[in-house]
């Protein structure tokens, strides 16, 4: 079983490396095509191979199966496994139970004394699509790991300002409808990447669903909100918070699963201690940048 997983992983990495080379070649062809159509100078680095690149520039682009790990995500509903760090507090257990109701088709398992490798292998054996692990500090949930199976990526988030359903008065019972998703102000390339990771944790909702989950970005903090709405007789819409609510701060994406993190490549890492870290936003593009 372990040798089979290692072989599949090596094949996946090999196919991805081949597609990266092909993707780089198509980008060069696109530059040549644009230069010829607009009658502009060809990039100095491409002039030597311009004739060869121009020969294949008339062919259409390719779709990359390996480059997008979520290409077939809409073909079937996601199957989520939710667990916690070792020796969880009662508050973290309660939070994991609430988050299990957030994700349709989710299954919560007790961590026990199993290590990460055993948890990932058990999730793969059940044909799960994603593994979510919640961590804590002194009884307060403070971290979320989202690992897409079977080959990654793995996204890391820190959590803050967690308010559970038990702390929200008169929140009522939680709806089990598939929720509609709202992603606000995640318009950069990295923002689209995190949108892809988060939205494929949920199945496709029905049009008449009254449940809404919002991921709203402000200064690289993603606010998670869960609401249910109903239409009154006079046509007004009443919005009720169902909880829980919290803030997510993404800080890393690894191109691998949790048991192979030591050998996995970094797709993106937040560098908090650089001189320009406070001035930059990674998940959104300002309107001034759009105007330029």
Curated annotation (Swiss-Prot):
Q: Name one GO biological process term.
A: rRNA processing
| A GO CC annotation given for this chain | Mpp10 complex
Source organism of the structure: Caenorhabditis elegans
Q: Transmembrane segments in this chain: where?
A: none
Q: What is this protein called?
A: Brix domain-containing protein ZK795.3
The record ties this protein, via Pfam families, to:
Brix
Brix domain residues: 78-259
Which Gene Ontology terms cover its molecular function? Answer: rRNA primary transcript binding; snoRNA binding
Q: Which domain of life is it from?
A: Eukaryota
InterPro entries, per the entry: Brix (IPR007109), IMP4/RPF1 (IPR044281)
């Amino acid at each position: 079983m372990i040798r089979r997983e290692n072989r599949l992983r090596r094949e996946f990495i090999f196919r991805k490396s081949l597609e990266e080379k092909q993707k780089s070649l198509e980008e060069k062809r696109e530059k040549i095509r644009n230069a010829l159509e607009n009658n502009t100078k060809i990039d100095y680095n491409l002039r030597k191979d311009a004739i060869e690149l121009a020969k294949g520039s008339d062919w259409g682009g390719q779709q990359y199966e390996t480059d997008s790990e979520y290409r077939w995500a809409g073909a079937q509903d996601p199957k989520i496994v939710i667990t916690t760090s070792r020796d969880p507090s009662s508050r973290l257990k309660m939070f994991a139970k609430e988050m299990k109701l957030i994700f349709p088709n989710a299954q919560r398992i007790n961590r026990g004394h199993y290590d990460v490798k055993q948890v990932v292998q058990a999730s793969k054996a059940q044909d799960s699509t994603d593994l979510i692990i919640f961590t804590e500090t002194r009884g307060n949930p403070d971290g979320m790991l989202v690992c897409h199976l079977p080959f990654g990526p793995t996204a890391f988030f820190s959590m803050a300002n967690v308010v559970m359903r038990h702390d929200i008065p008169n929140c009522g019972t939680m709806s089990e409808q598939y929720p509609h998703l709202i992603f606000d102000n995640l318009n950069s390339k990295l923002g689209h990447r995190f949108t892809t990771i988060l939205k494929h944790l949920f199945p496709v909702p029905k049009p008449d669903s009254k449940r809404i989950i919002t991921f709203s970005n402000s200064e690289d903090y993603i606010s998670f909100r869960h609401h249910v709405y109903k239409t009154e007789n006079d046509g007004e819409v009443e919005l009720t918070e169902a909880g829980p609510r919290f803030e997510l701060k993404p800080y890393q994406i690894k191109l691998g699963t949790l048991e192979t993190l030591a050998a996995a490549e970094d797709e993106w890492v937040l560098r908090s201690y650089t001189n320009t870290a406070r001035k930059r936003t990674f998940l959104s593009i300002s309107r001034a940048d759009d105007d330029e």
